[in-house]
Amino acid sequence: MLLTSSSPCESALATRYFRLDACLSSRYEVLDGRFTGEPVLPLCYGAGKVEHAESWAFREGIDLSRSYFYTDSNTDLPMLLRVGRPRVVNPDLRLRWEARRRGWTVLDWSRPDGALGLDDDASPQD
């Protein structure tokens, strides 16, 4: 499942490309077949991302406390706090600090050999 602040146009392409089961994204008003640019609230961003995820999880019978969430941005901190298995990938400095403080798994997917690496100071929580 893709949970993104991107528009439905962009996120639908990624959802199909990666063969994901579902996608939740920010939505924008359409009037007479054209985008007005006005967002439909809540945006799928920050705390709004949690609202979208909770509604979807309730409808689908998904337990977020047993779910994973992967991100590189500190703007996703509310969602990381909501799931049971937060994963931080190539984080910005603020998120790296927060992940270390909370003992979250930090993944390095930027290695040239394509290997996955774990941050030395973080350990898996499963």
Residue ranges of model-derived segments:
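C-terminal cap/substrate-recognition subdomain and adjoining C-terminal extension
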Residues: 1-126
